[in-house]
From Swiss-Prot:
Protein role: Necessary for efficient RNA polymerase transcription elongation past template-encoded arresting sites. The arresting sites in DNA have the property of trapping a certain fraction of elongating RNA polymerases that pass through, resulting in locked ternary complexes. Cleavage of the nascent transcript by cleavage factors such as GreA or GreB allows the resumption of elongation from the new 3'terminus. GreA releases sequences of 2 to 3 nucleotides.
The keyword Coiled coil is annotated on this UniProt entry: yes
GO BP term, example: regulation of DNA-templated transcription elongation
Pfam (any one): GreA_GreB
UniProt xrefs under InterPro entries: GreA/GreB_C_sf (IPR036953), TF_GreA/GreB_CS (IPR018151), Tscrpt_elong_fac_GreA (IPR006359), Tscrpt_elong_fac_GreA/B (IPR028624), Tscrpt_elong_fac_GreA/B_C (IPR001437), Tscrpt_elong_fac_GreA/B_fam (IPR023459), Tscrpt_elong_fac_GreA/B_N (IPR022691), Tscrpt_elong_fac_GreA/B_N_sf (IPR036805)
Coiled-coil positions: 7-72
Keywords: Coiled coil, DNA-binding, Transcription, Transcription regulation
PROSITE patterns found in the cross-reference section: GREAB_1
GO MF term set: DNA binding; RNA polymerase binding
Family as reported in the entry's similarity comment: Belongs to the GreA/GreB family.
Protein name in the entry: Transcription elongation factor GreA
Amino acid sequence: MINLIPMTVRGAEKLREELEQLKNVKRPRITVQIAEARKHGDLKENAEYHSAREEQSFCEGRIQEIESKLSNSQIIDITKISNDGRVVFGSTVTILNIKNNAVFTYQIVGDDESDFKKNLISINSPMSRGLIGKTVNTIAIIHTPSGNVKYKILKIDYI
């Protein structure tokens, strides 16, 4: 049995948009570049040709990677799943660092969607693992390389 990769609806949409761009814009553009470069003669020393072929290889590899991710993903719509007021995949969590009173808001997403600068954290991150299953006003102890950090869950959104 294949393990499905959890992915938010937004994450799947972004991958589909990228796939469409690669297939309908980039791939045809590269094909034209290769045809143009072939017109320049000897392919052994044709830098434009080799550059276009390399770009084609990267493009085709990315297309295969995205198609594989989408076919092996479990797309989860957070607005349609039961959560019982708990932190679950896809939820947005506002937490308070008990030690320094810093407040953070993160959304728990799939590995491929995570972007710490955008406050999107991977379901497999230590932070997510410590928050999953918790409810508002509970304390989550997050294990970090520099020691354990306590966070109070202030708010959970399912958007």
